[in-house]
UniProtKB/Swiss-Prot annotation:
Name recorded for this polypeptide: Translocon-associated protein subunit alpha
Positions bearing carbohydrate: N136, N191
Native source organism of the sequence: Oryctolagus cuniculus
Pfam families assigned to the protein according to its UniProt record, in alphabetical order: TRAP_alpha (PF03896)
Lineage: Eukaryota, Metazoa, Chordata, Craniata, Vertebrata
Note: Seems to bind calcium.
Length: 286
C-alpha cells in the first residue's frame, strides 16, 4: 500500500516527459504553427525582394537620364554645324623649343545668321590624359562678327618652354564663338600629339659662357708668356758698344755756338800732317 502512492507520483512525472519528448498533439501543433510562420516570413521576404528589384529597375532609367543631363550640362560646347574651321602652320608642324610658333585659323560661316568669334586659345596637355594641362597659353580675344557666307582668318603665336624640348605633348587649339541667340560653340581646330624639338641653332647661355671662359683662359696664357719673356730679357743686360766717328768731318758742329768753337780751336790747334821726305833712288838726276 505504501508503494502505490509512489508509483502514481512516478507515473505523473514520467508521462508528461514522454509526451513532450515524443511530440504529442500539442507539440505537433506548435511545430505546424512554426512551419507556417516560417513559410509566411519566407514568402514575405521574397515579395519584398521582388519589390526592391522592381524599384531598382524603375530607378535605373531615371538615374541614366539624370547622368546624361549632368553630362550635357557639364560637358564642353561643341562646334556648330553651320561653321567650318581650318588651320595652317606658317613654318610647318615643327615646334622648336624656346622659339615662336605661328599658325593661321580660318573660319567660314555657312549658315544664315551671324557668328561672333570671341577668342582663340592653345595649350599643351599630357598625352595620356588630355584633362591634365602642362602649359596653358594666353587666350587671344577676337570679338569679331562673321556675317553669313563670309570667311575670316585669325593669327596666333606661342612659344614652347625650353625644358619641354625632346618630349611629346598633346596640343589643343580651340576657337570659341557664339551666335546671336547666345548659343556658345567651341571648335577644336587642332587636337593631336606633337613633339617639341630641341633648339640646335643659335647659342644658349651655357655655350656663350663656355666660349667666354675659353677666351679668358687663352688671354691669361698669352699674358703669362709675355711676362715670362720680358723677365728673361731683363736678366740679360745689353752690352753697349761705343761707336766713334771715322773723321771729324762726319760730326755736325752746327749746333755748337761759334764762340765755343773758337775757344776749342785755340785750345787744341790742329796739326798739319808732315810731309815725309822722299827717298831718292840711286842714279837719279839731282
Amino acid at each position: 500500500m505504501r508503494l502505490l502512492p509512489r508509483l502514481l507520483l512516478l507515473l505523473l512525472l514520467v508521462f508528461p516527459a514522454t509526451v513532450l519528448l515524443r511530440g504529442g498533439p500539442g507539440g505537433s501543433l506548435a511545430e505546424a504553427q512554426d512551419l507556417s510562420e516560417d513559410e509566411e516570413t519566407v514568402e514575405d521576404s521574397v515579395i519584398e525582394d521582388e519589390d526592391d528589384e522592381a524599384e531598382v529597375e524603375e530607378d535605373e532609367p531615371t538615374d541614366l537620364a539624370e547622368d546624361r543631363e549632368e553630362e550635357d550640362v557639364s560637358g564642353e560646347p561643341e562646334a556648330s554645324p553651320s561653321a567650318d574651321t581650318t588651320i595652317l602652320f606658317v613654318k610647318g608642324e615643327d615646334f622648336p623649343a624656346n622659339n615662336i610658333v605661328r599658325f593661321l585659323v580660318g573660319f567660314t560661316n555657312k549658315g544664315t545668321e551671324d557668328f561672333i568669334v570671341e577668342s582663340l586659345d592653345a595649350s599643351f596637355r599630357y598625352p595620356q590624359d588630355y584633362q591634365f594641362y602642362i602649359q596653358n597659353f594666353t587666350a587671344l580675344p577676337l570679338n569679331t562678327i562673321v556675317p553669313p557666307q563670309r570667311q575670316a582668318t585669325f593669327e596666333y603665336s606661342f612659344i614652347p618652354a625650353e625644358p619641354m624640348g625632346g618630349r611629346p605633348f598633346g596640343l589643343v587649339i580651340n576657337l570659341n564663338y557664339k551666335d546671336f541667340n547666345g548659343n556658345v560653340f567651341q571648335d577644336a581646330v587642332f587636337n593631336q600629339t606633337v613633339t617639341v624639338i630641341e633648339r640646335e641653332d643659335g647659342l644658349d647661355g651655357q655655350t656663350i659662357f663656355m666660349y667666354m671662359s675659353l677666351a679668358g683662359l687663352g688671354l691669361l696664357v698669352v699674358v703669362g708668356l709675355h711676362q715670362l719673356l720680358e723677365s728673361r730679357n731683363r736678366k740679360r743686360p745689353i752690352q753697349k758698344v761705343e761707336m766713334g766717328t771715322s773723321s771729324q768731318n762726319d760730326v755736325d758742329m752746327s749746333w755748337i755756338p761759334q764762340e765755343t768753337l773758337n775757344q776749342i780751336n785755340k785750345a787744341s790747334p790742329r796739326r798739319l800732317p808732315r810731309k815725309r821726305p822722299q827717298k831718292r833712288s840711286v842714279g837719279s838726276d839731282e
